[in-house]
Amino acid sequence: MKRLHLAGIIPVANLKSDFQIPTPEILLPVSRDLTAIQKSVFECAMAGCNTIWIVANDDIAPIVRSTIGEWVYDPVYYRRPTRHSSEERREIPIYYVPIHPKDRARRDSYGWSILFGIHSAWYAGCLSRSLGRQHFLLEAKAGF
């Protein structure tokens, strides 16, 4: 039986809005301690995504990366009633993908950033399946 891998795609590249503010719109607060991008990542985690892909160009990616980070805890395993719940927590990795430079001037839309995020997640999955597990194992020689 095949296991389903659910990838959450959050497109923030080429996001256009009606707000006239100098900061990116994804950093606007939606509640007391939560910004819009943090809420999107939390909703992907609550939906059961195994990976989260944020499509952000190079101008906004460092801001998003400093706000979100590289991973988020899976909310299902965060507060399990076990003796050592901190050891059973699972992390959901967050990947940052920029739009390809040849597509930035021609295919510069919100919909294209969604499609590019889907394609990047699919391509990474195909690449990891074709390489197999043996290519990622490193063996240390005795004495090191």
Regions from the PLM with identified roles:
Residues 1-84:
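N-terminal glycine-rich phosphate-binding loop and ensuing alpha1 helix
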Residues 65, 74, 83-144:
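Conserved beta-loop-beta/alpha segment of the NTase-like Rossmann-fold superfamily
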